[in-house]
Amino acid sequence: MIPKGTVKRIMKDNTEMYVSTESVVALVDILQEMIVTTTKIAEENAAKDKRKTIKARDIEECDAERLKEKILQVSERTEKVNMLANEILHVIASELERY
């Protein structure tokens, strides 16, 4: 569902290394899992406020620690995730630590 071309372009814009199709597919799968996890946490946030609509603040208020844990879990889950995709996930996780 996430456009592979967009992901590949973002990856290539942030490295001087070559980006394999396999790494793009692996990262797309991981990003989709992250979206599902974030949505579930945001849904819990909306439900606490007795709403049926997920709002931006629900996403912003996602528990950074749970998201970080999931990101690291996914990045270490399989050997199919190559070094570049793994590094991108660690950068995302470290950015979450700031919040």
UniProtKB/Swiss-Prot annotation:
Transmembrane segments: none annotated. The keyword Repeat does not apply. InterPro entries: CBFA_NFYB_domain (IPR003958), Histone-fold (IPR009072), HmfB-like (IPR050004). Keywords: Chromosome, Cytoplasm, DNA-binding. Gene3D superfamilies: Histone, subunit A. The record marks K12 as: Interaction with DNA. Residues 52-55 are annotated as: Interaction with DNA. Its main location: cytoplasm. GO terms for cellular component: chromosome; cytoplasm. GO terms for molecular function: DNA binding; protein heterodimerization activity. It comes from the Archaea. It is found in: Cytoplasm; Chromosome. Binds and compact DNA (95 to 150 base pairs) to form nucleosome-like structures that contain positive DNA supercoils. Increases the resistance of DNA to thermal denaturation (in vitro). Homodimer or heterodimer with another histone. Dimers then assemble into higher oligomers, with the DNA wrapped around the protein core. Belongs to the archaeal histone HMF family. This is DNA-binding protein HmvA. It comes from Methanococcus voltae. The gene is hmvA.
